[in-house]
Amino acid sequence: PVIAAVHGVCFGGGLQIASGADIRVIDPTARMAVMELKWGLVPDMGGYALWKGLVRDDVLRELTYTNREFSGTDAKDLGFATYVDPNPVARAMAIAADIANRNPTAQRAAARLSNR
């Protein structure tokens, strides 16, 4: 599994990359936004396809069209975050340690089911 720990600014491609993780731990003060349209681009690195499974369609459209910035706390409510934690790296490492103690064959099988 891939775990993302996000703090600071996570705009555009950074948000797309973080969204590809299996588990996303976000600092509550992180600044996040779908910024591509502001720059004359479209979120075409796979982010939009991922977001459609995480975020309500009307909300995703609004975030994409307006480039509205949101916090890490908002990210949880919107569906972008699995957890919100003031120390995302420590939380991500704790989750990784827990996962590492599980059966790797079962982990791979679960990942295959999730990725269908």
Where are these regions (language model features)?
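Short alpha-helical scaffolding segments that buttress acidic/His motifs in well-ordered protein cores
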Residues: 63-67, 110-113
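Terminal peptide-recognition signature
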Residues: 1, 18, 75, 110
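Helix-turn-helix DNA-binding module
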Residues: 13, 76-78
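C-terminal long alpha-helix characteristic of the crotonase
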Residues: 25-30, 81-116
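Conserved active-site and cofactor/substrate-binding residues in soluble primary-metabolism enzymes
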Residues: 46, 70, 105
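Acidic, divalent-metal-coordinating active-site segment for phosphoryl/phosphodiester hydrolysis
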Residues: 67-74
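CoA-thioester-processing core
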Residues: 5, 11-64, 91, 95
